[in-house]
A protein has these predicted regions:
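A residue-level marker of the well-folded mature domains of exported/periplasmic proteins
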Residues: 1-188
Length: 188
């Protein structure tokens, strides 16, 4: 995994926060964001996840850093998690279903670290052999209903009078497939 320096939250940014509620993350720790196989400038999941970590860190005076696995493998995602924890991360944010096996392997090794998995479902949390693994209390997953956005897009284009339609997704991954199904149903 590759450490990538990120600017630390400034004192000025911490002073600007006027909210009375305490941040969900202790200022003693650090937020780590690990990219899947992309980069934080991909204009997609990695970038928006990184920008959100930066905004949260700046607002709450919490350090942040991102890590990019050396290769697109479960082992390298695990190595990136280990590196982030060694660097003091108390929260690790991971965008994408590819993190399922890494979470399954690491969640119990670091019970004091909060893992936030974006666009990951319980079905994605499998060990390196593909066996389903339960989610520990320190893991928070959120997934999207891409088919709803796809449905609305399909409906809108059909309502606009377009009848000769097609759908081309970037890759045949679960999120894109769900979006495509929704698009076709909305256009129908």
């Amino acid at each position: 995994a590759q450490r990538t320096a990120a600017p630390a939250a400034t004192e000025a940014a911490a002073e600007e926060s006027t909210e009375a509620a305490a941040p969900a993350v202790s200022a003693d720790g650090k937020i780590a964001m690990i990219t899947d196989s992309g980069d934080i400038t991909d204009e997609s999941f990695n970038q928006i996840t990184w920008e959100t970590c930066v905004a949260y860190g700046d607002k709450n005076g919490i350090e942040y850093q991102y890590y990019k696995p050396a290769e697109d493998t479960d082992e390298e995602r695990i190595n990136a998690i280990d590196l982030a924890v060694a660097d003091g991360a108390s929260v690790i944010v991971m965008p994408g279903y590819l993190f399922g096996p890494a979470i399954a392997e690491e969640q119990d090794l670091y019970p004091d670290v909060s893992f936030i998995a974006v666009d990951v479902t319980e079905a994605d949390i499998v060990d390196l052999s593909g066996n389903a693994v339960g989610i520990s209390d320190n893991v928070y997953i959120c997934s999207f209903q891409e088919e709803q956005a796809g449905y609305l897009a399909g409906y809108a284009i059909a309502k606009d009078g377009k009848t000769k339609l097609g759908f081309l997704g970037g890759m045949a991954v679960p999120a894109v497939i769900r979006y495509g199904y929704g698009f076709v149903q909305g256009a129908d």
